[in-house]
């Protein structure tokens, strides 16, 4: 009889091992066997929980996305209710510690690349993109006309992605302070009359 709660503990252990494997060996070097080795369990157990490598990557990305959505929700709730503060909170969530560790950043890069070839990952990417745009648009719409709010949301989303991507590819720890400053300056520019 399986231990109560063991399924979630084991899944978390395997997702952590997947993040470490992608960090150390990249997506091509990440296999069910490499994940099993890092988690000190059999390959059969990895297969039991996730089926195959695609299932493992999907579960890992769902975990990373949940962390992002949790950080976004937490920061928006904690922020003052004005659009500028809430927009800054959304930006900060994208540069949250849960999103900028080397294993997570490399997993994001692998996910983006693989999402162009895998329908389930593509769907996850579209959900994430729409959620970010919707959150940004909702806040900009409190201060700007609808069309401008949509354009501002698209611009800020592109800036977030660009700053994040440059940081991820820089080869060292991401300079979140510099990224946040640039994004805040952009928000301030758009809301200058606010």
Swiss-Prot record:
Annotated HTH tetR-type domain ranges read 8-68
**Part of which pathway?**
Amine and polyamine biosynthesis; betaine biosynthesis via choline pathway [regulation]
- Name any Gene Ontology BP term: glycine betaine biosynthetic process from choline
What PROSITE patterns does the entry give? HTH_TETR_1, HTH_TETR_2
DNA-binding region extent? 31-50
Q: Which GO terms describe its molecular function?
A: DNA-binding transcription factor activity; transcription cis-regulatory region binding
Which Pfam families does its entry note? TetR_C_6, TetR_N
Instruction: Extract the SUPFAM superfamilies matched here.
Output: Homeodomain-like, Tetracyclin repressor-like, C-terminal domain
InterPro entries recorded for this chain? BetI_C, DNA-bd_HTH_TetR-type_CS, Homeodomain-like_sf, HTH-type_TetR-like_transc_reg, HTH_TetR, Tet_transcr_reg_TetR-rel_C_sf, Tscrpt_rep_BetI
Question: Briefly, what is this protein's role?
Answer: Repressor involved in the biosynthesis of the osmoprotectant glycine betaine. It represses transcription of the choline transporter BetT and the genes of BetAB involved in the synthesis of glycine betaine.
Q: What is this protein called?
A: HTH-type transcriptional regulator BetI
């Amino acid at each position: 009889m399986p231990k109560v709660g063991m399924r979630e503990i084991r899944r978390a252990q395997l997702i952590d091992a997947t993040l470490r494997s992608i960090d150390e060996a990249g997506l091509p070097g990440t296999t069910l066997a490499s994940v099993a080795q890092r988690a000190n369990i059999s390959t059969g157990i990895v297969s039991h929980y996730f089926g195959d490598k695609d299932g493992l990557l999907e579960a890992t990305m769902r975990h990373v996305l949940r962390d992002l959505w949790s950080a976004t929700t937490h920061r928006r709730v904690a922020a003052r209710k004005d659009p500028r503060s809430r927009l800054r909170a959304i930006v900060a969530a994208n540069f949250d510690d849960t999103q900028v560790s080397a294993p997570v950043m490399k997993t994001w890069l692998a996910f983006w690349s693989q999402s162009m070839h895998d329908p389930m990952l593509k769907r996850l990417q579209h959900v994430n993109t729409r959620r970010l745009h919707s959150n940004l648009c909702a806040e900009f719409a409190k201060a700007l006309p609808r069309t401008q709010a949509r354009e501002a949301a698209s611009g800020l989303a592109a800036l977030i992605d660009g700053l994040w991507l440059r940081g991820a590819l820089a080869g060292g720890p991401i300079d979140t302070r510099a990224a946040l400053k640039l994004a805040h300056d952009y928000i301030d520019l758009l809301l200058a009359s606010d």
